[in-house]
């Protein structure tokens, strides 16, 4: 589908519609149904009524994503730069993590700027940009997202970072499955992981499944660490019995180190400890099995599965 290419300034002159109550949800819904013009009207109406707010910037990031996914890289880069500039201006008066909208907006702006650079053959510039952003925002909630995008460009073919609290069996290939208790896509991988384990664990594959705490339990209810830890175990027993063994390894450091801001994130490490696959998001059985089979078949760890 061809996306509408509109500069940011034109968002001020599109015919207004009543300002929506949940601009992010409304804009996402409009894009999901192909109603690009409607999404732009919603953004315009919200800005006219509320001004440029963190919620507006997050909603606008969905327009930016749409341009990127349609390979309209010039527009995506311009929009992302605008979101970045507005976000960093707000940071002069407030911390990033005071509420959720600004981190999501800024994280998207960084992700899309790096993505447009890489997509246009400017990979080294993308890596440098992400390294700079990692240094700038290293003490904030968006660091894992920045690292995810950096690792997408750099991790495959490199030694696997160590895992906090987990020892990878030496000389064995390993499948690392980063999951979250709230994650529906993680649960959708259960049948796939069950088949992968049944076939390849007897052939020497190690299966590791770290997670982390998020500060809440079912329904988004705030939870103390001990309560959430117990809830994680409850989810494991309910959904992942036979796939994820107890005790579950819980560590925020692992998620930051591997940039696992997307769950699931799937990492495949060969016998020599080299990352051969780094995949934020769910995978099909066929794709995952093919990657694992190639690593298993290589006895010396020189397989080049997915290596960039």
Per-range role (PLM):
Residues 239-293:
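Thiol/disulfide oxidoreductase modules built on the thioredoxin-like
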Residues 118-164, 226:
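N-proximal helix/coil linker or "cap" segments that precede and/or mark the start of modular domains
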Residues 166-187, 193, 207-210:
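Short active-site neighborhood of thiol/selenol oxidoreductases, capturing the structured segment around
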Residues 47-56, 86-103:
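Flexible helix-coil transition and linker loops at the boundaries of alpha-helical arrays
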Residues 188-239, 248-256:
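Structural microenvironment flanking redox-active thiols in thiol-disulfide oxidoreductases
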């Amino acid at each position: 589908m061809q996306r509408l290419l509109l500069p940011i300034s034109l968002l001020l002159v599109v015919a207004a519609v009543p300002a929506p109550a949940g601009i992010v949800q409304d804009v996402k819904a409009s894009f999901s149904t192909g109603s690009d013009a409607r999404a732009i009207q919603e953004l315009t109406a919200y800005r006219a009524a509320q001004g440029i707010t963190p919620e507006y910037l997050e909603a606008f990031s969905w327009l930016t994503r749409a341009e990127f996914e349609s390979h309209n890289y010039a527009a995506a880069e311009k929009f992302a730069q605008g979101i970045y500039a507005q976000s960093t201006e707000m940071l002069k008066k407030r911390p990033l993590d005071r509420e959720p909208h600004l981190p999501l907006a800024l994280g998207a702006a960084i992700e899309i700027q790096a993505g447009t650079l890489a997509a246009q053959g400017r990979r080294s510039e993308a890596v440098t940009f992400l390294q700079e952003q990692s240094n700038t925002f290293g003490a904030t909630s968006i660091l894992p997202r920045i690292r995810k995008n950096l690792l997408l460009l750099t991790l495959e073919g490199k030694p696997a970072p160590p895992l906090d609290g987990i020892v990878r069996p030496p000389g064995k290939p390993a499948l690392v499955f980063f999951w979250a208790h709230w994650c529906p896509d993680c649960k959708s991988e259960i049948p796939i992981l069950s088949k992968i384990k049944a076939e390849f664990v007897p052939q020497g594959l190690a299966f590791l499944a770290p997670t982390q705490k998020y500060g809440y339990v079912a329904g988004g209810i705030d939870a103390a660490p001990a309560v959430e830890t117990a809830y994680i175990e409850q989810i494991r027993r309910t959904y992942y019995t036979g796939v994820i063994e107890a005790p579950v390894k819980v560590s925020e450091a692992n998620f930051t180190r591997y940039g696992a801001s997307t769950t699931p994130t799937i990492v495949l490490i060969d016998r020599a400890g080299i990352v051969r696959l780094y995949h934020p998001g769910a995978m099909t059985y066929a794709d995952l099995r093919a990657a694992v089979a190639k690593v298993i078949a290589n006895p010396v760890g020189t397989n080049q599965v997915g290596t960039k």
